[in-house]
């Protein structure tokens, strides 16, 4: 065999009959396997030694030649070659079939490949192959048509009429003849002409046929090879027969399937020799076809062949498919030697790079090393003796083991391994007992706890593997999370509590207010018990007295020397930022030292503090009753409104839920306030939550406040909350509601974990071949990034989005003009600070989305590697890291729901508009009318505001140094005050002088308003921070009259488009527009003037509640109808994970919106077939049609001006529309924002570039729109780079290039469409992928990771890249003379 490492490509083709014969070492003629008396293989049977090789090493079957010296000799008596028995793993046989048989992969799988080539439907093809119908092969001079199907009677009739002047036949022979007669070139040009004729109306079948024909032409496969005359028999060791204890045999299912084929084949051969009647022969041929089908794919047939125990037999295809198939079970994941597993316990005494391995386990794992050392030390002279010494566990063995494991790393892995930090290397330390000891700080990366978790240990054997473990996988080299660059090794629970206690301040304790000259004096005073840890003291640091506490001095004293004095109470968040800061300033070695000190101090002082909780620590606020009574009063008022018919049932429900949410929030705030004051902040429950050691505000609320609203099984919120808390105890009904929530949490967790795991698998599959391959792709494109804001609040600063990327443009300081950032320069933390000081908050950076590297991405576009904060190395497998970064939190989040126990988490909706800081109203957008109490927005609107960042009274100013509207930055002189001091700006913004005030204001911002908002301020007003400027109804969207006049109903017919319901609770009549669609009816309300002329009309969507009567007078601002918002549901990542799934799979959402295809003016047209036609007239007067389902709530009205991409009705956006209307860049931004939104809501931080890598893979293909002079087919989907290559070639030859449009493909589909057939086959739909690949003669270039793992090569990333493989180490021989 060819050396497994020296090929670079692998190809798959259909085997011809000659090829199968050339593989074979002989024909299998009998169906026997083993002679049950002698237990030797039968001659010419399925295990025959003459064909497949000897079963005994270097011995022939009859025993005439018995020794290695006869190697290669073929025995003259039994014809068996003297060889090694391992040849039985590689030698194949064959079966000569008595009648041709079609291969099930090519005729049965949809679309049927043979059917497409011959243009026969699958059902017709089946009836020919199973000998039910004849097909005309040559019609001769009859009036039959070629390829016409005839049944038995028709065939006999034609035979009588025309005699032998035509030929028709059935079975695989007929199909074989037809395939042999095909002229592919002629067929191809015929189909291409048809496609040109049909143009846009091309059906998919034409495209499929053309693709298959082109594939056959290019690959050199012949169509008739899909019909088999010879059947290969796989080597016997791969379908073994094993003797069990009771003398019975267990055999592979394949042997049974082969036996059936051989038996039927032999029977058919006899029947043919005997010239048996046609009907019998035909039946036998059909049975042969069936048995070969079962052999190749038993699960795909309607009648599955079953074995002895009535279970379906496992055929060749089944052996490849699925999780238990060859690919996933044996090639992508293997069980490995030198490994063990055990329960983990905490090892507080370990260093960060160590783990404790039980001595017994270590001895077993390192056995070969120990044996070698024993022999080297001449204690023993053979392996057998060494093994017995090890079994006796003599002292010498333990000494040797100690030496062996020194500096020999081991890998620890915890399942599920969701990201690369699930396997890390440690130096082993021998421990007593049987449990593995794990360092407490690495638990977070493993997501491990010590409640019975198990971990696996692996020993890297070769020096290269050990070196990689030390250099790359050691726990001390993996301090940062590759997903976002934040530390992943940080303290939690006990350690945090200990340090929080140590660094807290307490009033009136021993030693308060004392002064100390240095740290040593403080420590001495503590040891002498004359100073309390929590006492506030003054210590001299760098010649100055600093107010701090004794505990903080203890903490700082222990830290490594370089770190500046940390003077604050340390919570988990503070500790994480301290670790981050130290990492950036001092590097990893100091951090590692610091982490072990933090662990040690934390545990020590947690023990000293010895916190316990009792019932008296749970303090229920006395004001609870007041809050609950107030809520009940508000609810009575809401109920009253409902009874009067002012609000609908849905609004009532939403308002009630909102009241309880607010009450719960207020009560919680009060409770936390009380707990904080209790015992000077040393209330243990409060300390645990505040330090972040355990528990949360939400859990304390349930202990001491009220449990709050609960969710039903459906996810709806039950409007009656649980008012009790756990301290007071729950009533029976409250307890019952609680149990439901708790159970649901656990059930959901189990289901969603599988979901998130599957998401990770698909992500890995699509991105596995994205590797950093080159330094610079030379692109000039980039993406624009800016800080993400929610109104005025910065959700994600520019730093998070831009640090570690490379700039694509040169940025100069607007003041000095010097270059801050040059082209292709890395954006570092310092550069961002510089940009922020001069007021630049937008950047254009290089991104993976715009990278033009042909395979993978380039270093410059990827930027920084977050796992070490350095520029990414060439060879880094960034695709897999991206997939893990997105998949891992998915799984984490799904596991996190049950801790709160099903408590509903819907926020209370606010109905007031107030801004956090002072501002000036600069302008309004949107249709609004003047009413008594201000402005009323009849449709959606926008406020344009400028925030006031700084203000000063002009009277306090002596001399101004700036002009109105001038831009200022930090440090710029503003004015000289009355005392003659220069006042410098501490902000970035613009100067505004208004009403004797000097202000610095921000750039203009937009705040969107809902329809129905009442605004109490006017343009130009200055508004103080926190003032309520407007109100709206959060639970209903009103349709408001914009003119005065009379109401006239149009197409509002009771019983058809209008439904009157008597509300049983209130007795009121509610008028609701039905959501049924009627062809000719379009319910609207017209407003007419005194002369009866229509002024305007309002279209009423389905489910709108009418608020007016026909013929009544109406004023500007009156509500005509309103739409209730759906009731609140609790949202956790269950809402999140399916959403992420849908986005990555690019599924079209259920409740779709229609987007304006172009910018222009809206024109309403009639309803046709249940859809309303809306035209948008563009600037050239061209009409663009949009069809919208009639019941939908429209967001535009007749005559509105819209921009391309604006939503015309409510609903979800379809990503494919975004691509079509707004283009690729907008689509990337849309997907990125939507996916990040789901994760951000859950508090998960993932860097954009990871999601970018996946989106890039989803947009790899383009669809051919015009063929030009290329070989492409209209509507074909091709790889971008293949498209550019071919176009380049055509242009060079002076031809016309093809035109294509970008398309978006979901991750599953994209994984199956990948260039590597090995990778696609090992993902899903194995047989389909292999069928198509074999027809096309696909070549796998082995560029990705999966395909290399499957065939046993080193993966082409990191040290496995060709770039590094060619490195040679030479000794420098030029020594001095």
Swiss-Prot record:
Q: Which Gene Ontology CC terms are recorded?
A: DNA-directed RNA polymerase complex
Q: A Pfam family in this protein?
A: RNA_pol_Rpb1_2
Q: EC no.?
A: 2.7.7.6
Disulfide bridge positions per record: none
Q: Which reaction does it catalyse?
A: RNA(n) + a ribonucleoside 5'-triphosphate = RNA(n+1) + diphosphate
Q: Which SUPFAM superfamilies match?
A: beta and beta-prime subunits of DNA dependent RNA-polymerase
Query: Which metal ions or organic cofactors does this protein require, according to UniProt?
Result: Mg(2+); Zn(2+)
Q: Does the keyword Transferase apply?
A: yes
Chain positions recorded as Zn(2+) 1 binding sites: 60, 62, 75, 78
Question: Which InterPro entries does the entry mention?
Answer: DNA-dir_RpoC_beta_prime, DNA-dir_RpoC_beta_prime_bact, RNA_pol_asu, RNA_pol_N, RNA_pol_Rpb1_1, RNA_pol_Rpb1_3, RNA_pol_Rpb1_3_sf, RNA_pol_Rpb1_4
Which residues are noted in the entry as Zn(2+) 2-binding? 777, 851, 858, 861
**UniProt keyword annotations, A-Z:** DNA-directed RNA polymerase, Magnesium, Metal-binding, Nucleotidyltransferase, Transcription, Transferase, Zinc
Q: What enzyme category does the UniProt record give?
A: transferase
Instruction: Please describe what this protein does.
Output: DNA-dependent RNA polymerase catalyzes the transcription of DNA into RNA using the four ribonucleoside triphosphates as substrates.
Q: Which NCBIfam families match?
A: rpoC_TIGR
What protein name does the entry list? DNA-directed RNA polymerase subunit beta'
Q: What species is given as this protein's source? A: Borrelia hermsii (strain HS1 / DAH)
Q: Which gene encodes it?
A: rpoC
């Amino acid at each position: 065999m060819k050396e497994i490492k020296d090929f670079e490509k692998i190809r798959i083709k259909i085997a011809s009959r000659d090829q199968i014969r050339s593989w074979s070492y002989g024909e299998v003629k009998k169906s026997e396997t083993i002679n049950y008396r002698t237990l030797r293989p039968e001659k010419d049977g399925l295990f025959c030694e003459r064909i497949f090789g000897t079963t005994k090493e270097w011995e022939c079957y009859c025993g005439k030649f018995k020794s290695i010296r006869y190697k290669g000799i073929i025995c003259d008596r039994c014809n068996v070659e003297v060889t090694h028995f391992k040849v039985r793993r590689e030698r194949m046989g064959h079966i000569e079939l008595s009648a041709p048989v079609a291969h099930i992969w090519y005729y049965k799988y949809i679309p049927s490949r043979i059917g497409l080539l011959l243009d026969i439907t699958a059902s017709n093809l089946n009836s020919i192959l199973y000998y039910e119908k004849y097909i005309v092969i040559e019609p001769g001079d009859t009036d039959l048509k070629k390829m016409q199907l005839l049944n038995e009677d028709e065939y006999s009739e034609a035979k009588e009429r025309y005699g032998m002047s035509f030929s028709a036949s059935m079975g695989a022979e007929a199909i074989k003849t037809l395939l042999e007669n095909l002229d592919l070139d002629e067929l191809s040009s015929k189909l291409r002409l048809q496609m040109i004729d049909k143009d846009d109306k091309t059906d998919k079948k034409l495209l499929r046929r053309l693709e298959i024909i082109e594939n056959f032409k290019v690959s050199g496969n012949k169509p008739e090879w899909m019909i088999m005359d010879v059947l290969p028999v796989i080597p016997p060791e791969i379908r073994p027969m094993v003797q069990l204890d009771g003398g019975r045999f267990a055999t592979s299912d394949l042997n049974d399937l082969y036996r059936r084929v051989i038996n039927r084949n032999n029977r058919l051969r006899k029947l043919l020799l005997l010239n048996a009647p046609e009907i019998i022969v035909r039946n036998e041929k059909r049975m042969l076809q069936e048995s070969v089908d079962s052999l190749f794919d038993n699960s795909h047939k309607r009648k599955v062949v079953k074995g002895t125990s009535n279970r379906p037999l496992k055929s060749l295809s089944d052996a490849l498919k699925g999780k238990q198939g060859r690919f996933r079970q044996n090639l992508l994941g293997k069980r490995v030697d030198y490994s063990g597993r055990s329960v983990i316990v905490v090892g507080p005494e370990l260093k960060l790079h160590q783990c404790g391995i039980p001595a017994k386990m270590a001895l077993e794992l390192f056995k070969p090393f120990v044996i070698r050392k024993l022999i080297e030390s001449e204690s023993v002279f053979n392996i057998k003796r060494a093994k017995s010494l090890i079994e006796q566990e003599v002292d010498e063995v333990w000494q040797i083991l100690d030496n062996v494991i020194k500096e020999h790393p081991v890998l620890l892995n915890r399942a599920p391994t969701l990201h690369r930090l699930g396997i890390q290397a440690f130096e082993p330390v021998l421990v007593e007992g049987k449990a593995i000891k794990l360092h407490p700080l690495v638990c977070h990366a493993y997501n491990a706890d010590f409640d019975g978790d198990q971990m696996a240990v692996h020993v890297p054997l070769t020096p290269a593997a050990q070196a990689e473990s030390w250099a790359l996988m050691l726990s001390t080299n993996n301090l940062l999370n590759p997903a976002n660059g934040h530390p992943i090794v940080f303290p939690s629970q006990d350690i945090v509590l200990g340090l929080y206690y140590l660094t807290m301040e307490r009033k009136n304790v021993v030693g308060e207010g004392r002064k100390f000259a240095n740290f040593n004096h403080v420590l001495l005073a503590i040891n002498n018990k004359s100073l309390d840890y929590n006492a506030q003291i003054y210590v001299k640091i760098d010649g100055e007295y600093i107010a701090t506490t004794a505990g903080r001095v203890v903490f700082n004293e222990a830290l490594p020397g370089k770190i500046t004095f940390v003077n604050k109470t340390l919570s988990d968040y503070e500790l994480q930022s301290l670790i981050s800061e130290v990492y950036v300033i001092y590097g990893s070695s100091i951090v590692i030292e610091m982490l072990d000190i933090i662990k040690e101090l934390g545990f020590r002082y947690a023990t000293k503090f010895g916190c316990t909780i009792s019932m008296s620590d749970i303090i229920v606020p006395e004001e609870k009753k007041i809050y609950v009574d107030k809520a009940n009063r508000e609810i009575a008022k809401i109920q009253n409104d409902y009874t009067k018919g002012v609000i609908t049932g849905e609004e009532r429900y939403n308002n009630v839920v909102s009241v309880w949410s607010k009450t719960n929030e207020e009560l919680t705030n009060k409770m936390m306030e009380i707990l904080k004051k209790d015992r000077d902040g040393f209330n243990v429950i409060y300390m645990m939550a505040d330090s972040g050691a355990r528990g949360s505000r939400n859990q304390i609320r349930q202990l001491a406040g009220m449990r709050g609203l609960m969710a039903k099984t459906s996810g709806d919120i039950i409007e009656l909350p649980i008012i009790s808390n756990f301290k007071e105890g729950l009533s029976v009904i409250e307890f019952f509601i609680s149990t439901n929530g708790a159970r649901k949490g656990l059930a959901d967790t189990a289901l969603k974990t599988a979901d998130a795991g599957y998401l990770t698998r698909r992500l890995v599959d699509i991105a596995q071949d994205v590797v950093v391959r080159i330094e610079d792709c030379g692109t000039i494109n980039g993406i624009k990034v800016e800080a993400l804001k929610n109104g005025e609040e910065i959700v994600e600063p520019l730093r998070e989005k831009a640090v570690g990327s490379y700039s694509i443009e040169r940025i100069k300081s607007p003041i000095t003009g010097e270059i801050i950032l040059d082209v292709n320069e890395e954006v570092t933390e310092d550069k961002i600070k510089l940009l922020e000081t001069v007021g630049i908050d937008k950047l254009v950076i290089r991104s993976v989305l715009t990278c033009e590297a042909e395979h993978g991405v380039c270093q410059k576009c990827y930027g920084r590697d977050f796992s070490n904060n350095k520029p990414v190395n060439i060879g880094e497998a960034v695709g897999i890291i991206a997939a893990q970064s997105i998949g891992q939190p998915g799984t984490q989040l799904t596991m996190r729901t049950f801790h709160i126990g099903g408590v509903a988490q819907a926020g209370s909706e606010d109905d007031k508009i107030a801004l956090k800081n002072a501002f000036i109203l600069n302008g309004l957008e949107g249709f609004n009318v003047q009413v008594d109490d201000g402005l009323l927005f009849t449709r959606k609107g926008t406020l344009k505001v400028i925030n006031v960042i700084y203000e000063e009274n002009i009277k306090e100013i002596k001399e101004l140094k700036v002009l109105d509207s001038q831009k200022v930055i930090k440090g710029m002189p503003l004015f000289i005050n009355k005392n003659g001091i220069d006042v410098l700006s501490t902000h970035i913004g613009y100067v505004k002088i208004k009403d004797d005030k000097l202000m610095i204001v921000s750039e203009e911002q937009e705040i969107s308003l809902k329809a129905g908002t009442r605004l109490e301020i006017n343009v130009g007003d200055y508004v103080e921070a926190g003032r309520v400027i407007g109100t709206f109804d959060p639970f209903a969207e009103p349709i408001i009259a914009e003119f005065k006049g009379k109401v006239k109903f149009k197409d509002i017919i009771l019983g058809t488009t209008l439904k009157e319901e008597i509300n049983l609770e209130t007795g009121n009549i509610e008028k609701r527009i039905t959501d049924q669609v009627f062809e000719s009816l379009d319910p609207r309300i017209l407003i007419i003037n005194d002369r009866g002329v229509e002024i305007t009309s309002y279209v009423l969507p389905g489910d709108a509640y009418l608020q007016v009567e026909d013929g009544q007078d109406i004023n500007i601002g009156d509500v005509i109808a309103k739409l209730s918002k759906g009731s609140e549901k609790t949202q956790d990542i269950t809402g999140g994970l399916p959403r992420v799934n849908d986005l990555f799979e690019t599924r079209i959402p259920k409740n779709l919106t229609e987007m304006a295809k172009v910018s222009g003016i809206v024109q309403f047209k009639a309803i046709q077939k249940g859809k309303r036609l809306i035209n948008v007239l563009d600037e050239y007067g061209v009409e663009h049609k949009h069809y919208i389902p009639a019941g939908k709530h429209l967001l535009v009205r007749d005559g509105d001006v819209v921009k391309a991409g604006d939503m015309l009705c409510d609903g979800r956006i379809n990503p494919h529309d975004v691509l079509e209307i707004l283009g690729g860049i907008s689509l990337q931004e849309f997907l990125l924002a939507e996916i990040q939104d789901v994760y951000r809501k859950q508090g998960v931080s993932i860097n954009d570039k990871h999601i970018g890598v996946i989106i890039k893979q989803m947009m790899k293909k383009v669809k051919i729109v015009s063929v030009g002079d290329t070989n492409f087919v209209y509507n074909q989907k091709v790889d971008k780079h293949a498209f550019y290559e071919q176009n380049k070639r055509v242009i060079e030859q002076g031809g016309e290039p093809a035109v294509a449009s970008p398309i978006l493909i979901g991750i599953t589909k994209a994984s199956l469409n990948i260039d590597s057939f090995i990778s696609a086959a090992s993902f899903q739909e194995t047989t389909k992928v292999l069928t198509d690949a074999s027809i096309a003669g696909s070549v796998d270039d082995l560029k990705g990771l999966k395909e290399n793992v499957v065939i046993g090569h080193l993966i082409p990333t990191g040290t496995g890249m060709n770039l590094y493989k060619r490195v040679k180490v030479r000794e420098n021989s030029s020594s001095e003379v």
